[in-house]
Structure formats: structure tokens, C-alpha cells
UniProtKB/Swiss-Prot annotation:
Organism: Methylorubrum extorquens (strain CM4 / NCIMB 13688) (Methylobacterium extorquens)
Oligomeric and partner information: Tetramer of two alpha and two beta subunits.
MF annotations from Gene Ontology: arginine-tRNA ligase activity; ATP binding; glycine-tRNA ligase activity
PANTHER family: GLYCINE--TRNA LIGASE, CHLOROPLASTIC_MITOCHONDRIAL 2 (PTHR30075:SF2), GLYCYL-TRNA SYNTHETASE (PTHR30075)
GO biological process: arginyl-tRNA aminoacylation; glycyl-tRNA aminoacylation
GO CC terms: cytosol
Reaction catalysed by this enzyme: tRNA(Gly) + glycine + ATP = glycyl-tRNA(Gly) + AMP + diphosphate
Primary location recorded for the protein, binned into one broad class: cytoplasm
Name of protein: Glycine--tRNA ligase beta subunit
UniProt entry tagged with the keyword Acyltransferase: no
The UniProt record lists the keyword Endoplasmic reticulum: no
Length: 696
């Protein structure tokens, strides 16, 4: 079956945009084909610094004919409805429609629309120009004489050529006939910008890939990454060194070269006095190079790996020397930052925080630090931390924001603060908290273990959440510019993974200047939503989470989790499943009878009347009283498994009651009391969760 080959060659595409652009191209083209009824066997997109490419395999040469019956308005309908029908169906008059009789709805018009199958080549020529002209680049530009025209082509960098061919493997493919702003699709492309700039012709995908390889272009980004990684490791191994792997940098560098050539440079040992993280940040950020460490050690080596886009005649000596000069200059700057920063204590830097605006509505970093310090001291006893150390750590936590090193490399905030604090004789826990209070910064990041770090981390995140809730800057949909979901998840993970007992409502009380109760309740609801997401990711059932959160006062996240776990384990047993079924039956009966009677059956049942009734009625009343008391005591003791065991003993009497007892008895008093017994079952289960929220 025929294949499509599409290449869009331009000047350099920023590395960070390449993968997304390739996937966008694939989705836009394949979606447009499927929308028009053209299915395909497979599609794969590619990106290099100078081209996007797409291969769609197994397309039909021609689309199938389509016959559609479109129902119109009733015969005799208003003229406007008839004209709308004719227009939508592409008919000139009602003479071109047929009339169909429906036994229930009468006569109505029917249009039979037949569309002959179209040539795939024609369809491609129709859809590709629009996709190219409306391509969703994050940033784009216009260029040349055409840029003055309204609606002219926008591309990430000037588009230079388009390859678009279509045809089967056994025949010469055809060029898809279209052009965009004077660039006409053809079969001609070119290779590496410096190594093989001459144009050459390509026909189909296999030829295209091989021709690019001969022209020093490796089309597949993953293959470029693999070459870089393995060559870098081999080069390091040959020198007795290990590569410090960096997936983000590897992805970026693979997007900077079409023909990767791995080289190694070096710098003077004296620069190793700088913290390893600063060396790595300097070499990574400024030169896009990988650092190396001594084999079998965490200690950095005075060497680095660089990736060139050229096969140099001198073996890369000049390229390496040029990179070494720049790296030395950058490391000299980093060394100056390091020495300059060490000369000033973190505490002496605090006044500068008063001139840094955190948010225009939330004051300065200095004001924020004061709030975090007070909250950290309050949280400290709850997490077994020293309040004085927690307050001290919070006071210094943001001081490194005004250091030279963090000013140059913001990604080192916290880490450099820890190093400066340690050099200045601060307590180990204080120094650790300065770095760790930002954690966790992502789902794979670890939660702090030191109690002081935990106290400051919680205070920092809670202050952030309270502040943005106070000014009504909450996350909406997919937008979360201040990473408030991440902050809430950080609090949740710290509480759960470190088994912390905290009442969020108590910690939030009085934090809001106005509307305290409403804002606190709204923020607690946000925590509940985030906890649901977290627990779902851990495999918990969403309905069980809802069932626990439906109970009042659920602001102790650790207890919520333990209750959900116990409830899940209970409902996985036969006793749990049968009790849930019994609950559902009781709740359904109550709902029907309460609606019919216009009243709620929510008082306690008459024990004497139940005792004088049928044996199963008496047994259920006794079991409910005992189970509710036992479950309540177990919940109070935080023994949720024990509470579930208490409920499990209701299974047999509930089953027997429904089997032998008629709830809607003729005697009104007896009927009422039996409905109250069912309400007692509802109340007993509510000791542990709202069973009405549980599916099944």
C-alpha cells in the first residue's frame, strides 16, 4: 500500500521544541486523514535541528465511496427548517430528497448523499498546506517579502523546503502537489548544513533515511541520544573515568546536532575546590557539556564531555580547545562567586530579602520568611523537631537567593544555602533544612527525613497555599502558575510518608485575614481533592476515599489514609461485600419509605418493641447496638481494622433479618420500628465511612 513521506526543512529548531513538534505533526496529519475516512497502518514522526519529518505507512491509494442518509424535517415543516436541511445536505430543492413515512412520527424528508471515493494524493494536497500554515509552534516568526502580507506563513525559523511524496514501494512515488507561501513541495532536500549541504533527491522513506545518513544526518533523535551516550561512556572509560549521566542534557544535546561527534576536554584541578554541583551547573548551562567523575568515586574529575556537530579534519582538537577556554572562563566566574559568597554570612544577607517582591499582593520575601519562621516553630513540636532550630532554619532558608552563585544559577537555591550554612557553623539540621525545605519537588523526589527539615518544608508550602488562597489565585483547570497542586502534594506526601499526625484545620486557623472559615474550608477541600489523586495513583478506590471524606472533621490526612486502607481491606472480604449489599438494600428501602411518608426515620429504634418481635429482629437490634458501640470505641482508639471487625459481625443478623422479616408490616408501630432498625444499620456503618458513597 502507498506511503506518505513529508519533510519540512528549516533553519535551526530550538531543541526544547523538537519532540513536541514532531508529535504535533503526526497527530495533525493522521487526524485529518482519519477524519476524511483514510485509515493507515502506522505513522512515525522525527525531528532534527533542521527538519521535521513524517512517515505514514499503509494508506489507500483512493478513499472508499460514501453513502449517507441524512434525515430532514417533517413534511410541512416551516420553510426555514426545510432550507436549512437542503443547505446542510447540499441539495438544490426538495425534488432531490425522498419522503419516508414513520408510523409514529409521520412523513419526513430524507436526503441520500453519495460521495465518490477521492484520490489520496488529492486529499493530501488539500490538508497539508493548512496544517503547515496553522502549525502550533510555541513561538514562531515571519520572514522575507511575504511577511508583510496578512496571513503569511509563520514558522519557528524560516522554512526552506518541503518534501512530500506519496506512492507504493513498487512504483515511483508522486509529489503531493501543493505550495505554501511560494515554497513548492518536491522530492529535493539537503543533508548536514556543513558536511553535506548539496541538494539531493529522495523518493520514499527508506531511501530518505539512507540518503540522509550518507549526507551526515541521523534522523532519529533516540538514535542520536544512543550514539552520544555510548560514545561518551566509552571515551570516559578509556580515560579511567565515569560519565555523570544527565537525561535532560542528553535530550537537549541530541536536539542540537544532526551528526553527533563526542569529544573530551579538561580543566585545571584547582577548579575542583568549587562545589561539584556548581561545576556541573556551570558546564551544563553554559556549554551543554557533561561532567565526569573519577571511576568508582563521587568525586568529580577535571574533565568534561562535549558533543560537536562536525567531523573536524584535526580530530576535533580546535573544537575541544575552544570549549576548554570557555569552560575555564566560566569556572573562574563560578570560583569568584563561591569565594565572594563565603565572605558574607547568610544572616547578614536577610535585610536584602526585604527588597525582593515575592508577589505584588503578598509582600516581600522578607515578610514571607517571617511568616514561615513563625509557622515552622509552631509545627516543630508536632513533628518532633526543636522549635528553635526550626525557626532558625526558616529564617535562613531563603537567604541564598541573594548570593552571587544562586543569582547566576537559580537551580542551586537551597543547595548552596546548605553549603554556606555548614561553612558558617550552623547546626547540621539547620543547614539540611535550608536545602530540603523545597522537597519534594516532584513525584519521584524524596520527602525530607530530618524533623527540622519537615517542619520548615511544611511551613513553606502551607504559607504558599494560604497566601494564594487569600488573594484568590487558585489553580483553574490545567493552569497552575504557582505550582499550588505540587505544594499541596508535598504536604500530603510528608504527612503520609513520615506518618505525621497533623490537624490541617488547626494549622490553618487564623491564617487568613478575612473570610477565614470559608477560605479554610475551601483550602481543606483542595487538600482532599489532591489526596484523592494521590491515593488513586497508589491504587486506592476513589469511592472509598469519598466515603471517608464524607464524614465530618476529616483533616488528619494520615488517619484518612489508614481508614481508607482498612475499609478497602474489609470490603475485599465476603463479610464486607455482603454487609455493603445489606446496607444498600436498607438505604434503598429507607429512601423509598421516607419519600412516601414525607418524614425521616432518624431516631433510635424502640429496643423493647424490637425485643418482642421476631427472633431475627431482636438479634439485629442487639447486634447493631453492640457493633456501633464497639466500632465507635475502635475508631476513637484509631483501630480502624478493629472497627471493621465490629461491622463484620453484622453480616449474619442483617442477612437473616432481610430473609425472615417483612419491613413494611401491617402494624404501623412495628413498621416504623423496623425502618428505625434499618436507620440504625446506616448509623452503625457511618462510624467508619459513608457507605452511600461506595460503589457496588
Amino acid at each position: 500500500m502507498p506511503d506518505l513521506l513529508l519533510e519540512l526543512r528549516s533553519e535551526e529548531i530550538p531543541a526544547r521544541m523538537q519532540r513536541r513538534a514532531a508529535e504535533d505533526l503526526k497527530k495533525l496529519v493522521t487526524d485529518a486523514l482519519v477524519e476524511r475516512g483514510f485509515l493507515y497502518e502506522g505513522a512515525k514522526a522525527f525531528a532534527t535541528p533542521r527538519r521535521l519529518a513524517l512517515h505514514v505507512a499503509g494508506l489507500p491509494a483512493r478513499g472508499e465511496a460514501v453513502r449517507e442518509e441524512r434525515r430532514g424535517p417533517r413534511v410541512g415543516a416551516p420553510e426555514a427548517a426545510v432550507q436549512g436541511f437542503l443547505k446542510s445536505a447540499g441539495l438544490a430543492s426538495l425534488d432531490q430528497a425522498t419522503t419516508v413515512t414513520d408510523p409514529k412520527k409521520g412523513e419526513f424528508y430524507l436526503a441520500v448523499i453519495e460521495r465518490p471515493g477521492r484520490e489520496t494524493l488529492d486529499v493530501l494536497a488539500e490538508i497539508l498546506p493548512g496544517i503547515i500554515k496553522s502549525f502550533p509552534w510555541p513561538k514562531s516568526m515571519r520572514w522575507g517579502a511575504a511577511s508583510a502580507q496578512p496571513g503569511s506563513l509563520r514558522w519557528v525559523r524560516p522554512l526552506q523546503s518541503i518534501v512530500a511524496t506519496f506512492g507504493p514501494e513498487t512504483e515511483t512515488p508522486e509529489v503531493v502537489p501543493f505550495s505554501v507561501d511560494g515554497i513548492t513541495a518536491g522530492m529535493v532536500t539537503s543533508g548536514h548544513r556543513f558536511l553535506a549541504p548539496e541538494p539531493f533527491e529522495v523518493r520514499r522513506f527508506d531511501d530518505y533515511v539512507q540518503a540522509l545518513e550518507r549526507a551526515d544526518v541521523i534522523l532519529d533523535a533516540d538514535r542520536r541520544k544512543d550514539i552520544i551516550l555510548h560514545d561518551a561512556k566509552d571515551l570516559a572509560f578509556a580515560r579511567g573515568l565515569d560519565l555523570v549521566e544527565d537525561e535532560g542534557l542528553l535530550e537537549e544535546v541530541a536536539g542540537l546536532v544532526e551528526r553527533p561527534v563526542v569529544l573530551m576536554g579538561s580543566f585545571e584541578e584547582r577548579f575542583l575546590e568549587i562545589p561539584a554541583e556548581a561545576i556541573r551547573a556551570t558546564i551544563r548551562a553554559n556549554q551543554k557539556c557533561f561532567v565526569l567523575r573519577k571511576s568508582g568515586s563521587d568525586e568529580l574529575a577535571p574533565a568534561f564531555v562535549l558533543v560537536s556537530n562536525l567531523i573536524a579534519s584535526d580530530g576535533g582538537a580546535a573544537i575541544t580547545a575552544g570549549n576548554e577556554r570557555v569552560v575555564r572562563a566560566r569556572l573562574s566566574d563560578a570560583r569568584f562567586f563561591w569565594e565572594t559568597d563565603k565572605a558574607t554570612k547568610l544572616e547578614d544577607r536577610l535585610p536584602k530579602l526585604d527588597s525582593i517582591v515575592f508577589h505584588e499582593k503578598l509582600g516581600t520575601q522578607g515578610e514571607r520568611v517571617a511568616r514561615i519562621a513563625a509557622l515552622a516553630a509552631e509545627i516543630a513540636p508536632l513533628v518532633a523537631a526543636d522549635p528553635a532550630l526550626a525557626e532558625r532554619a526558616a529564617r535562613l532558608a531563603k537567604a541564598d537567593l541573594v548570593t552571587e552563585m544562586v543569582g547566576e544559577f537559580p537551580e542551586l537555591q537551597g543547595l548552596m544555602g546548605r553549603k554556606y550554612a555548614a561553612l558558617q557553623g550552623e547546626h547540621d539540621s539547620v543547614a539540611a533544612a535550608i536545602e530540603e525545605h523545597y522537597k519534594p519537588v516532584g513525584p519521584s523526589d524524596r520527602v525530607p527525613t530530618d524533623p527540622v527539615s519537615i517542619a520548615v518544608a511544611l511551613a513553606d508550602k502551607l504559607d504558599t497555599l494560604v497566601g494564594f488562597w487569600a488573594i484568590d489565585e487558585k489553580p483553574t483547570g490545567s493552569k497552575d502558575p504557582y505550582a499550588l497542586r505540587r505544594a499541596a502534594l508535598g504536604v500530603i506526601r510528608a504527612v503520609i510518608e513520615r506518618s505525621l499526625r497533623l490537624s490541617l484545620a488547626s494549622l490553618l486557623k487564623g491564617r487568613f485575614v478575612s473570610g477565614s472559615d470559608e477560605r479554610t474550608a475551601d483550602l481543606l477541600a483542595f487538600f482532599a481533592d489532591r489526596l484523592k489523586v494521590y491515593l488513586r495513583d497508589q491504587g486506592a478506590r476513589h469511592d472509598l476515599i469519598d466515603a471517608v471524606f464524607a464524614l465530618p472533621g476529616q483533616d488528619d490526612l494520615l488517619m484518612v489514609v489508614r481508614r481508607v486502607e482498612a475499609l478497602g481491606a474489609f470490603l475485599a472480604t465476603d463479610d464486607g461485600k455482603n454487609l455493603l449489599a445489606g446496607y444498600k438494600r436498607a438505604a434503598n428501602i429507607l429512601r423509598i419509605e421516607e419519600k412516601k411518608d414525607g418524614r425521616a426515620y432518624d431516631e433510635a429504634p424502640d429496643a423493647a418493641l424490637a425485643a418482642s418481635g421476631q427472633p431475627e429482629e431482636r438479634a439485629l437490634a442487639e447486634a447493631l447496638a453492640a457493633a456501633r458501640q464497639e466500632a465507635s470505641a475502635a475508631v476513637a482508639a484509631e483501630d480502624f481494622a478493629g472497627a471493621m471487625r465490629a461491622l463484620s459481625r453484622l453480616r449474619a443478623p442483617v442477612d437473616a433479618f432481610f430473609e425472615k422479616v417483612t419491613v413494611n408490616a401491617d402494624d404501623p408501630a412495628l413498621r416504623k420500628n423496623r425502618l428505625l432498625l434499618l436507620n440504625a444499620l446506616r448509623a452503625a456503618t457511618r462510624e467508619v465511612a459513608d457507605f452511600s458513597r461506595i460503589e457496588g
